[in-house]
Amino acid sequence: MDSDSDAILREPPPAGNELDTLLGALERQRGYVAWKCGNLDSAGLRATLGPSTMTLGGLLKHLAAVEDDVFSVKLHGRDRHPPWDTVDFGADPDWEWHSAAEDSPGQLVSLWQEAVSRSRALVAEAIADGGLDRLASYTWPDGRTPSLRRLLIDMIEEYARHVGHADLIRESVDGLVGEDPE
């Protein structure tokens, strides 16, 4: 994310239908992440704030993992994509956070962008195969199966939580603040 064009913040439609509003809200959160993690070197992506070990690089890698887990594995029942397909999360449940320090900014950004691109295609596939009511390919421990609608809400929540973290970390790196790159 070397340019502001990577971090275009798209507003959801002010009076859109449910699908356009959900997808718009998710894309807006992705845009915030792109902006807050953009144009940083390795030191910026490895910076921490206070006692936390969270970094913007770890955040990018984590969100790439979540994109893959939610839309490839849970929604469609497909195998994990690399690098997640060879990770022993039982040995290190936070592997993506810990291993991000070994990756270059370009690797982290590419990993996240590729995961987002795959997710967009997988969501479009699910929309064509049942819309927001399409059920996921997995069930919760209590036997219920979430719909695409629920998975989109969960992803919006995941991103919104981490955008708050990204705001604080990025401000500590170089003073960048705000909600809009304009």
Identify the function of each model-found stretch.
Residues D2-S5, L9-E11, L19-G38, S42-D94, ...:
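Short, contiguous alpha-helical
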Residues L9-G16, D20-L23, S99-G106, S110:
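Charge-dense, low-complexity intrinsically disordered segments
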Residues D92-R134, R149-M155:
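Acidic/histidine-rich alpha-helical segments that form the ligand environment
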